[in-house]
Amino acid sequence: MAAAQPKKIRMVAGLGNPGDEYARTRHNAGFCAIDELARQANVTYWKNQSGAEVASINVNDPDAEGGKREVLLVKPQSYMNTSGGPISKLCAANRISAEELLVIHDELDIPAGDVRIKVGGGHAGHNGLRLIIDKLGSRDFSRIRVGIGEPPGRMQVADFVLKQLRAKEAEEFDDAAFRAAEAAALALTRGVIFARDHVNGGASGNGKH
């Protein structure tokens, strides 16, 4: 028996930290992917709502009224570890369930530059995900995981994820953020399961599994 298809995505939230000092750091992979997704969708207006920057896009959906489904793009402005607050408030205000939420975040346990999709699951030590799970009371949301690799040598994790990227690192990071945005767009139009199988199967990215 085939697994049930998750509900269609109505919100894509990218995790990161607000402020220019964090803009070019690994921890802001989610923000960068959301910015790229917004650029591809020609978003020109963001509003401040429930402690987050929020934009709205329409995606093709034959099952929706008028053939379009509204999707919210969200960048919480409460810093990474407390992102669950704004996200849960926006979900409640818009009657969006955990299954209709897609979160884009950095992932230490995946090689730098890799992009993978996961449906549900735990937080794996990621404090941003930890509070989202706590606030929603559910682990059923989908995730796009942007690999950043592990810290070199004895470098602390906090220093690694908040360190400004060097030129070559930034190029790889930007490419991964672009592919994460493409993965999100695919999930919006074709469904999370299709996008997961396509992306994780090596059809997108650098071929690492």
Model-derived features: positions:
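Short glycine-enriched, charge-decorated loop/helix-capping segments at active-site entrances
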Residues: 116-122, 161-165
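Nucleotide and nucleotide-moiety/phosphate-recognizing core
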Residues: 1-120, 129-145, 151-156, 171-209
